[in-house]
Amino acid sequence: MHIRNLYKTLAFYICAVLAVAVALGFMPPQRTSGRDSLGFSAQRVSDDIRVIAKEPHSIQHTKERKVLGEFLFYRLQQMGGDTQIIDYDTIPSKIGGKFSYSNIYSVYPPQGADGTGNKDFLPDSTISYILLVAHYDSRYRQIVGKDTVFSYGAADDGYGLGIIMELVSGALKYRDEWKQGVKVLFTDAEEHDMDGMRSAWKENPEIFSDVNLVVNVEARGVKGPALLFETSPGNEKVMELYGEAHRPHGMSLTSFVYTFLSNDTDFSVVKDSIPGMNFAVIDNLKHYHTDLDNYSNISLESIQHYGDQLEPVLKEYLTGEEYSARDAFKGERDIVFFALPVLGMFAFSKGGWLLLNAAVFALFLFVLYIYVKYF
């Protein structure tokens, strides 16, 4: 009798631990890569975030936002991108007054397409691009208790800015292998009403005309695993590419839930037209949009996890000839996916998902029968 109770207790605790781990998005602690690493380095990203998060840079901070925009322009240009600052008309602010805003846009074609001498010259009109997106404005004023506070934008969206620059820097090391190119779009006024992305979509079709995949890098907290929390409709081919990720972490349920929430991201503007993925950390929500979103609270482990997932995905995209078609990622089916600690990512068609659920239910009934009959 004691042995049976021991088995039952042990089984209960194992199930409880697994359930909590899945619910919390548990990922085993990982070592971050140092500044001298040949691969993606969270330490190097943190150097950029230190500059990005020096001061609040919301739509209420015109000078600070301009200084940050110039820094980002310089960094992208320094890496060899054809970089420009795109200004838009002044618009009314929903918190009073008016403000102006500007996007930062940079293009990195494959070698040969930009006159670098690659023997396999590719005409510009035949090249497809991945568009990496983050926003460089921080949250405008927020009331916390009795205080008015401003976010420093270290995670939201310093993570996105720094991670994208590190990804591009790493990808340029194998540029002679590229079959596709990279575009970077750092949008302004995302926190207000996604004004930068809305204006780019409406007024700058050249940014998107040759893009067949969008990756948006966001933050909904400051730490925790980097979650693939949203994909475009018909995501089967997008998820095939995401299968290249190291330490993948995501679940399709979050995409479903997110459709009912009011807080959109830049990805919301384009996801129904261009296939793509949306990433964010979601732990420590109490820091979100407050002055606690500052450099001292960033998580190198979280930053490294973004990079561990996106670095191999980007390399596969850039070097794979099968991704050159404009419709390479347009699928007919939605894939149900989820990640389990240690075991990794599981993906199913909706039909396969129903069969899996039926099999699990049948297994449950069998175990229940054995338990009732013999225990």
Where are these regions (language model features)?
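Short secondary-structure boundary micro-motifs
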Residues: L6-T9, Y13, V215, S252-L253
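Hydrophobic membrane-insertion alpha-helices, especially the h-region
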Residues: K8-L24
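Soluble extramembrane regions of membrane proteins in the secretory/endomembrane system
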Residues: Q30-A347
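Core alpha-helical transmembrane segments of integral membrane proteins
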Residues: A339-F375
